Amino acid sequence: MLVLTIIPLFMVFIVKSQHLLFGNSIDWFNQHVTLADALRHAIRSEGTIFPTYLSNLMSGVNIYHFSYYGTLRFDVLLGALLIHVKMVNIIIFYQVFLIILTLIACYLFLRNHLKNRYLCFLMSLFTLLSALFFQFHKQIMFVNYMPFLFLMLRSIDRYFISQKITSIVIWGSCIVLHSYFYCVGCFIVCFIYFMLHCYRYKNYKKHFLHLIAAYLLIVLLTAIYTIPTLFVIAGGNKSVNATNYLSLLIPTFSLKGLLYNNYGCGLTYMFWVLIVFGLFKEKTRTLSIILMISMLCPIVSLIMNGFLYARSKILIVFLPLVILQVGLVLENNHFKINKYMLFLFVFPLFFIQRSELVFLDLIISLIILYFSKINKKRCFIYLLVPLFVVYYNNPTTSFLPNKQYKKYANQEVETLIQRNFINTLVNMNEIHQNMNQTYQNQVTRLSGYTSTNHHLYNSFLFDTLKIPISLNNRVGQIDQNNL
C-alpha cells in the first residue's frame, strides 16, 4: 500500500514541477477555493461549525444555497481551524489525501473478494487512471466522496460477518457531508451491492431492514445539513427542459458513462470487454447485467440524478462495482470468445467517437487478456493505455499556472481593502474568477455563484432589474457596471 501512496504523490509532483497548481484553470479557483475560504470564515464569524448565513456574498445569503459544494467538508472545517493557512494549500493537500485514501480503500475492498494481491494492486491503479484524477482537480464534489463509498461497501462486507451497521452509518454520513448531490447515487450503488449479498440468505428481510435502519440513521445524523438543503433545492425551483421519458428507455451504445469521458467513469475499452465476459459466467452474470443496463439506459442516469436530468456524469458512482466486477472476471479468466461476445465487443464501436482508436484499444485488450490467462501480471502492460488517456485528458493547459493564481488572488486588492477600510467591493478585474472571493471576509460582495440560487432572487435580478446574463446560465451573478 506504500506504493499506492507514492504513485499519486509522484503524479502531483510532476504537475507542481511544471509551475502548476493541482487545480483546474476554469472552475476550480472561482468555485472551490474562494467558496471554501468564504465558508470557513463564516464558521469563524458565527462561532459554530453550523453557520446559517453567508453575509459576504450576494449581499448576504442563506449559507445552504452553497451546500452543493459541501459546507461541512472536512477540509473546510480544517480551514476554519487553521485560519491563517491559505485555503488553496489546504484544498490541494486534502484532495491529494483523498486520492491516496481512495486507492487504499479500493485495495482493502478488493482484498475481501480477490485472492491475488497483484490483481488488487492493478485494479487500484486502474482506479487512479480513471476520471478520478481529472475531477479531483476540477469539480471536487463529483469525486470527493469516493474513498468513503469504497469504505461503505467494505463495511457492507463486514456487516454480513458481524451483523453491525455502525461503520455503514459512519462512512455513509461522510459521503453526505462531502457531496449531498451524489449521495443518492452512492446509496443506490450500496443498496445494489447489499442485495447481491442478501440473495444468498433465506432470511433476507432481516438484513434488508438493517440496511434501511442504517440509511435512516445517516439521515438523522446529517439532518442539520440535509433538511435545510432540501428546502433550498425546493425553493430554487430550477427549471429544466421537458424530458421525453420514453426516449430515455431506448439504450444508447456510446458508453459515455463508462469509457474515456471525464464526466463518467473514464475507463478504457478493456473494462467493457470484461463486463461482457462476466455476462457469460454464472458467478458474475448478475452484476454484469446491472452494470450494462446502468451504462446503456439513460433512464438510470435520470433516476440517479433525482429526475433532474439524464446526464451520464452521475454514473461515476458505479466505479467501485465496475472495478470489482473486472477484478472478479480477470481472476477467473478461462473462457473462449463466442459470436455473442464478439457482437457485444464490436457493436459499440459504431457509436463511439474516434472509433479507429477505440478499435485499436479493443485489439490490444484482447491480446493482453489472451496472454494473461496463465500469468495475471501481464495485465500490468495494459496500464499504458489508461495512462495515455489520462495524459490526453489532463494536458498542462487544464491546470492553473502559479502566475495565473497570483493574478486571481490579487494581494494588492487585499492590501487596498485593509488600508482604506473598504466594506463593499465591486471588482471588475477577472470578474469570472473572483465572483465568490471575499478577501478573508473583509468585504461584502454583490456577486456570487452557486448552482442552487433562489429562484425568486434570481428572477428579481434578471427579470425585474433586467441585469444582463453574462454567463451561460442564470445561477451566477457577476460584478457589472450597472450594479
PLM regions: where:
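Start-transfer (signal-anchor) and selected internal transmembrane alpha helices
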Residues: 1-18, 210, 370-379
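Membrane-embedded helix bundles of polyisoprenyl
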Residues: 4-9, 95-113, 117-160, 164-199, ...
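Membrane-interface coil-to-helix junctions
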Residues: 7-103, 126-146, 233-238, 245-264, ...
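Periplasmic/ER-lumenal interhelical loops and adjacent helix-loop junctions
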Residues: 74, 207-316
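Soluble catalytic regions of membrane-associated enzymes that act on cell-envelope
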Residues: 81, 380-483
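Membrane-interface helix caps and helix-loop-helix hairpins in membrane proteins
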Residues: 89, 132-142, 176-184, 259-260, ...
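Transmembrane alpha-helices and membrane-interface helical segments
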Residues: 104-109, 150-158, 190-198, 275-279, ...
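Contiguous transmembrane helix-bundle modules in multi-pass membrane proteins
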Residues: 289-296, 304-405
